[in-house]
């Protein structure tokens, strides 16, 4: 089941498996973080598209995903599909790494599947800049993937864009850690 969340211009939020999410307040905080992170990612890099999916508990029960699209992509505002993590989106990217691909490199990449069954309805991928959002804990557990596409004016993403995205992902990971720890303390206090 997908519910649309958000309400900010450019946002498309997907709540994945909301019937199993047991903490609406946490879900609202995560939605706000996703919205702000996607919005900042676009502002910092000049991207026309940003997407971020996180799974705070690691079991898929409260997974959330946001897209933030420029006006150029208005026709994709109704696109609502649970991400399956295939193709480029399923690549393992180590904590602290960024993948930066030009459009030609996207199309030549062995993991590129042109969105499989969603090819006709998925927003196009015009270049790709992606990094994991990870916990600051020792295990650096990945919460999700922050990804951008289509730099304004047809430019390619730069090394500076990659650095800004990496810093933003680290900030988002630290914020998710704080949310996760606050929820754990709250649950422990209720017991």
Language model: regions and residue ranges:
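Signal-transmission linkers at sensory-effector interfaces
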Residues: 1-36, 40-43, 175-191
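GAF sensory/regulatory domain recognition
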Residues: 39-40, 51-84, 106-107
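Acidic/proline- and glycine-rich, intrinsically disordered low-complexity segments
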Residues: 73-101
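Signal-transducing coupling segments at domain and membrane junctions
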Residues: 74, 102-127, 150-151
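A short, aliphatic-rich beta-strand micro-motif
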Residues: 126-137
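Short beta-strand-to-loop transition segments that serve as allosteric relay/switch motifs
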Residues: 135, 145-155
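Glycine-rich acetyl-CoA-binding "A-motif" of GNAT/NAT acetyltransferases
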Residues: 139-142
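Allosteric cytosolic regulatory segments
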Residues: 162, 166-174
